[in-house]
C-alpha cells in the first residue's frame, strides 16, 4: 500500500485547509480593492472658484496669443501693401520714362513736317499733291501722340516761365509787353503734366522806344507891334 493511501483523512483535511486559505486570500484582496475605491471616492472635489480662476487665466493666455497673431498679421499686411504700392509706382515710372523716350524721338519728325509746311508754297499741282501726301502722315503722327497723352504748349502771348520756356533771345516787341513770349522758334510739349521739351522762345523787352522829340522853341506872344505884315494888308511905307 502506498504511503499516501495510509492516511486518507489527513489528505482530505489538507485539501480543505488549502481551499480555506485561498478563500481568505480572495476575500482579503476584495477588501483591499474596496478600501481603495472608498478612499478614491472620499477624495474632496475641487473648489469651483479655483476652477473658474484657472479657466479665466487660460482664456487670458489665449486672448494674448490671439492679439499677438493679429498684430503680426497687420504688420505683414502693411508690409505687403507698401511693397505693392512701391512696385506699382516703379512700374508707372518705368512706363512713363519709356513713353517719354519714345516721344522725344518722334518730336523732331513732327518739327520737320511743320517746317516743310511753312516753306512749301503750293504753286503747282505737284507741290499740292506732295503737300496732301505728307499731311496725312503728319496728322497720323499727331493723333498718335495725342493718344499717348502728349499735348503742345501755347507759348506766344504767355508770360515767360523758365519751367516751360527756354529763352534764346530778348527783343523789343510792339505787340507784347515786357517779359511776355513774343516769338516761338520751337514748340514745347507735355506728356500728361510733365514737361518733356521746353519751348524755345524770344521774350519781349517791351515796346521799342520812340525817337526823342526836339525841344520846344520859345515863342513870343504876338502883340500889335510884333504882328507880321499880312500879304493881303501890306504895311504902309
Swiss-Prot record:
Family matches, as PROSITE patterns = GRPE
* Example GO BP: protein folding
Name the Pfam families on file: GrpE
Q: Which domain of life is it from?
A: Bacteria
What keywords sit in the KW lines? Chaperone, Cytoplasm, Stress response
Q: Which residues form a coiled coil?
A: none
Query: GO CC terms for this protein?
Result: cytoplasm
What Gene3D superfamilies does this protein map onto? 3.90.20.20, Head domain of nucleotide exchange factor GrpE
Protein localization: Cytoplasm
Annotated region (Disordered), positions in chain: 24-56, 204-237
Q: State the Gene Ontology terms under molecular function.
A: adenyl-nucleotide exchange factor activity; protein homodimerization activity; protein-folding chaperone binding; unfolded protein binding
Quaternary structure and partners: Homodimer.
Role of this protein:
Participates actively in the response to hyperosmotic and heat shock by preventing the aggregation of stress-denatured proteins, in association with DnaK and GrpE. It is the nucleotide exchange factor for DnaK and may function as a thermosensor. Unfolded proteins bind initially to DnaJ; upon interaction with the DnaJ-bound protein, DnaK hydrolyzes its bound ATP, resulting in the formation of a stable complex. GrpE releases ADP from DnaK; ATP binding to DnaK triggers the release of the substrate protein, thus completing the reaction cycle.
Query: What is stated as this protein's family in its record?
Result: Belongs to the GrpE family.
Instruction: Name the chain's protein.
Output: Protein GrpE
Native organism: Synechococcus sp. (strain JA-2-3B'a(2-13)) (Cyanobacteria bacterium Yellowstone B-Prime)
Amino acid at each position: 500500500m502506498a504511503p499516501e493511501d495510509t492516511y486518507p483523512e489527513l489528505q482530505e483535511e489538507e485539501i480543505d485547509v488549502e481551499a480555506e486559505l485561498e478563500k481568505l486570500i480572495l476575500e482579503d484582496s476584495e477588501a483591499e480593492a474596496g478600501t481603495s475605491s472608498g478612499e478614491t471616492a472620499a477624495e474632496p472635489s475641487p473648489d469651483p472658484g479655483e476652477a473658474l480662476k484657472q479657466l479665466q487665466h487660460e482664456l487670458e493666455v489665449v486672448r494674448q496669443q490671439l492679439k499677438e497673431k493679429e498684430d503680426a498679421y497687420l504688420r505683414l499686411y502693411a508690409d505687403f501693401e507698401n511693397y505693392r504700392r512701391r512696385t506699382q509706382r516703379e512700374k508707372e515710372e518705368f512706363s512713363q520714362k519709356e513713353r517719354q523716350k519714345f516721344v522725344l524721338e518722334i518730336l523732331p519728325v513732327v518739327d520737320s513736317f511743320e517746317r516743310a509746311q511753312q516753306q512749301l508754297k503750293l504753286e503747282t499741282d505737284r507741290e499740292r499733291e506732295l503737300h496732301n501726301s505728307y499731311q496725312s502722315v503728319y496728322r497720323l503722327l499727331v493723333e498718335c501722340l495725342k493718344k499717348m497723352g502728349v499735348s503742345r504748349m501755347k507759348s506766344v502771348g504767355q508770360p515767360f516761365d523758365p519751367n516751360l520756356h527756354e529763352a534764346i533771345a530778348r527783343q523789343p516787341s510792339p505787340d507784347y509787353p515786357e517779359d511776355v513770349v513774343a516769338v516761338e522758334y520751337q514748340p514745347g510739349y507735355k506728356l500728361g503734366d510733365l514737361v518733356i521739351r521746353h519751348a524755345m522762345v524770344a521774350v519781349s523787352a517791351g515796346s521799342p522806344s520812340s525817337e526823342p522829340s526836339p525841344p520846344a522853341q520859345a515863342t513870343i506872344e504876338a502883340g500889335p507891334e510884333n504882328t507880321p505884315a499880312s500879304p493881303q494888308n501890306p504895311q504902309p511905307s
